[in-house]
């Protein structure tokens, strides 16, 4: 089990040298819509690369054509695939067909299925691409939890809950403000598998690999 944060230009004052050593992983906003690129993303990604920190990168969905948004995401992060975990941040009025089109374009062009971040109810509508791991946002009633907080059981969805954002006002040493804090129910090896990093002795993504982290959750990666 890993604990980490997701950040964007809204945390422009965050100093990686102060905060990142205190977390297990970092997910950075990379793009939005068809024209926005987060100027802080690459600096944070390079810190993670230099220091061996698991990391991810996400696209914030707008309501443009999903193919154009996917291409914008890929074009501006092409050298991230195979190292970090790609994510679609689904918070707007996009329908399920929009989401599925986006993630399938990403997979078709990169060979990697992105995670999908959303509230549980969005997944529970049914029909969301099952190859994509679910990163859910659901907040227990607690003020300013840290990375050591136990939020209990995550809400159920229609698929695998691999990551849970359990607060938007979390606190992490090295940063004075609120942060999104998360639990990943897997190991560093599982994280790398989602990113498409080849494991030792393998030339491609693992096939049929299961990683059991505790008595409640199992992360399974199956090549399609």
Whereabouts are the PLM-identified features?
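Histidine- and/or cysteine-centered catalytic micro-motif in compact active-site loops
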Residues: 60, 91, 119-121, 139
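Aromatic-lined carbohydrate-recognition surfaces of secreted/lumenal glycan-active proteins
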Residues: 111-124
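Intrinsically disordered, low-complexity boundary segments flanking structured domains
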Residues: 44, 75-77, 121-125, 144-154
